[in-house]
Amino acid sequence: MITENILDIIGNTPMISLKAMTGLDIFAKGEYLNPGGSIKDRVAKFMIEAAEARGDLRPGMTIMECTSGNTGIGIALVGVRKGYRVVIIMPENMSEERKKIIKSLGAELILTKSSEYINGAVCEAARQKAMDPNIFVVQQFENPDNPLAHYKTTAVEIWDQMEGEID
């Protein structure tokens, strides 16, 4: 498979049989094979595209999100590829690896005090949004499109890949 757009390879991850390890018919979805390395690529793409479809996110706007890591990586991957300025806000004590990945994807990073946990990041996003109406805050923790991504995509893939043989 050759693709011009990395977003085309988010999702459609394989089902992996764990029978050799467990002796049972247990399967796992290989979401770690998404380009950002986690299931969060799928929800990031879904939340951003749903916001675009509703008109909540338009060209020229900035995508902002508070995260401790993997969702920020997914949002950076998707948002930057779609041409948006992406700003990720996270506590300063998150791993250097995550910070470097987010920056390498082209997103900006704002670090908040680790003593404020994720709440500090949420407050900073609210402060930034109040100053600039052209900021779209994803709000993964409250966003109904987050779980809907799995209902509309992950579940359908599992059903199809397992040919309906699920108990």
Task: Label each residue range with its predicted role.
Residues 1-167:
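PLP-dependent amino-acid enzyme catalytic core
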